[in-house]
A protein has these predicted regions:
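Long, low-hydrophobicity, solvent-exposed regions enriched in small/turn-prone and acidic residues
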Residues: 2-69, 73-80, 92-94, 104-106, ...
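A low-complexity, Ser/Thr/Gly/Pro-enriched, surface-exposed linker/loop concept
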Residues: 87-88
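Hydrophobic or amphipathic alpha-helical targeting/insertion segments
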Residues: 109-127
Length: 610
């Protein structure tokens, strides 16, 4: 991984250590030590200054062996090697350090009992290796793994590490993102190999790996496991999806994710899906309970662009192939001002449209520009906007439009094809109302990776969405919102030491209506209520609901149950309105992104937030 890649970077210092005797010889001469030796072959590091200190130094000119004992410290640039004993055999071009071996570069530190290095072959090994790596100091952004820790320090242990100029291999390796002992979380593997890639990143392969939680719970990891700065899907996704307008309900979904291709610029993930509730009793047979998903991404760094392809087949029933397939291809370009241009084609895209429920957009072809968040001077106001043009094929009402959601659902059976121009903007500002004073006695995090930021904030905003359709219809919505967000408690005590409350009210002016169902606005005035509360230890429960104040109906709701620790957590959430849910494993800093495999649809009743 990127942090451990420092090992051979630091150990490479010893590859330059052949100049050590020359530097030490000067000190030895002052003490009446060995006579000057031939240093013709030692000029490779003439431009580098190597300093060596120890309690005792000797040089055997006949055997060409230099030895230092007692509090040995060798410095080369920013690198420091410490040991009880150091022996450099110039004839064999080999260095051996023994006893409390320590290699340090800035905040990176690696220790062991014995280090052996062959200058000629540029190979070596370190026994009983352990240490910590400050991954915040490493610059190879594509290297594995970033992130096992928000503290930016990764600790590791290995029985032995073999290394050369481009690879290292560890035996019985344990990695942890926990600064305390015993660690809450460890990644264990009997064999870990890291290989330097052409782009400067490292490929980490862990064989027969495990995640160990609190030394009592063990979860297997894939044989081939890679960590880097790129988001990727977790090894296994578990979620629930039992709501679909066309009755293709899948229920519980078990989805292993296999990375068939992955480098910093290209990735291909193939994800078989198993629907246990459809395996028995389905009229379509056993294959109706099996699905398949594929995700492909291609980054073009020189063009600041990324192309992605998603496809999902919900049941291997070829007679209904067109109905069961969902797909999307998208090309995104980051502009010089920090905005983003996107070109998209989507087939059978799912949208959640509030009181209109799930809607299927059969075909959508379009382009959009999303601005970065712009701070307006010293006002504290944040502005963002979005412009989009699409050609859409979806269920709709081209002529007379039913503004009542129930009538619209009952009377809309035909697909229509129209072009749409959509403009949207948001203007927000947050006001801190209260925060507790900071003290030196504030306890360190216990159930969270980082200290909890406590306080009460007032949030205000104005948003506008304008949509124009090629049949002459238009939909306009401009609204204001105000809300309170409160976080009380540091989440370190055993009970009721964390409470998060959120209340947001919004109201606006609605004119016209979309001819489509998927983007029709049906909720003009709404209230959002949410809370997250610690019960005992790492256990928290929460809920969030959105209520249409004009009809009194519950538009959306989600319930959460979480088990959170410093370095990992489990989360179970369920939405009875959408009839969907998910079980997620969070490993702090580990770059698994459950959202990449989630079935959650886009919200269609507003313009997508910039």
């Amino acid at each position: 991984m990127r942090g451990l890649r420092l090992l051979w970077l630091c150990l490479g210092v010893l590859g330059l250590a052949v100049a050590g005797p020359t530097a030490a010889q000067v000190e030895s001469q002052k003490k009446g030590g060995a006579q000057p030796m031939d240093t013709t072959d030692l000029s490779a590091v003439a431009d580098r200054t190597l300093r060596l200190r120890s309690d005792r130094q000797t040089f055997d000119q006949r055997a060409e062996v230099f030895q230092a004992e007692g509090n040995v410290e060798m410095r080369l640039g920013r690198s420091v090697l410490r040991a009880d004993r150091l022996r450099i055999e110039l004839r064999q071009r080999r260095a051996v350090a023994e006893g409390n071996v320590s290699i340090q570069l800035d905040r990176q530190r690696i220790q062991g009992s014995r280090l052996e290095y062959d200058f000629e072959q540029e190979r070596g090994f370190l026994e009983e290796a352990f240490g910590q790596v400050d991954i915040g100091q490493l610059q190879a952004s594509g290297s594995p793994a970033a992130a096992l820790s928000p503290q930016r320090l990764v600790r590791f242990r290995a029985v032995r590490i073999r290394f050369d100029a481009t690879t290292w291999e560890g035996e019985q390796v344990r990695l942890t993102n926990d600064p305390l002992d015993p660690p809450e979380l460890e990644i264990r593997s009997p064999r870990v190999t890291s290989t330097l890639q052409a782009d400067g990143s490292s490929l980490l392969i862990a064989e027969a790996g495990q995640l160990a939680f609190d030394q009592v719970l063990f979860l297997p990891l894939p044989i081939r496991l890679r960590f880097d700065s790129l988001n990727r899907q977790p090894p296994v996704s578990i979620f629930y999806d039992d709501f679909d307008r066309e009755e293709l309900r899948r229920g519980l979904i078990l989805q292993p994710n296999f990375e068939l291709l992955r480098d910093p610029n290209v990735s291909l993930v193939l994800s078989p899906q198993l629907y246990p509730q459809r395996l028995w009793g389905s009229e379509q047979g056993l294959l109706d309970g099996i699905g398949l998903r594929a995700d492909f991404r291609w980054r073009q760094p020189e063009a600041n662009a990324q192309t992605s392809l998603f496809a999902e087949l919900r049941g291997i029933v070829f007679q209904e192939f067109a109905q069961r397939l969902r797909a999307q291809v998208e090309h995104r370009i980051t502009t010089g001002d920090g905005g983003e241009v996107a070109y998209t084609y989507a087939y059978r895209e799912r949208f959640f449209s509030g009181r209109l429920g799930f809607q299927i957009v059969e075909n959508r072809l379009g382009a959009s520009y999303r601005s970065p968040t712009l701070r307006l001077g010293n006002t504290g106001l944040d502005l963002s906007y979005r412009i989009a043009a699409d050609y859409i094929d979806a269920l709709g009402q081209p002529d007379e439009i039913d503004t009542d959601p129930e009538l619209a659902l009952a009377n809309t059976t035909d697909r229509i094809q129209l072009s749409r121009l959509q403009l949207g903007a948001t203007l927000n500002r947050s006001f801190p109302l209260w925060s507790p004073p900071k003290t030196a006695a504030d306890p360190p995090p216990r159930f969270s990776a980082l200290p909890i930021e406590q306080g009460i904030w007032l949030s205000t905003g104005v948003s506008s969405s304008q949509s124009f359709y090629s049949n002459g219809r238009a939909q306009s919505y401009t609204a204001g919102s105000i809300g309170i967000d409160a976080v009380i408690g540091a989440f370190v005590a055993d009970t009721f030491d964390y409470t998060n409350l959120r209340v947001t009210y919004s109201n606006g002016f609605l004119a016209g209506a979309s001819p489509f169902l998927f983007d029709r606005i049906t909720t003009r005035e709404q209230l959002v209520l949410g809370f997250l509360q610690q019960l005992y230890g790492p256990l928290r429960v929460g809920a969030e609901t959105t209520v249409d104040l004009q009809s009194g109906q519950q538009v959306d709701v989600v319930y959460r149950l979480g088990y959170d620790r410093r370095t990992y957590g489990f989360s179970l959430q369920y939405n009875p309105v959408r009839q969907s849910g998910a079980l997620e494993l969070r490993v702090e800093g580990l770059n698994w992104d459950p959202g990449q495999s989630s079935p959650q649809p886009t919200t269609g009743s507003r313009i997508q937030e910039p």
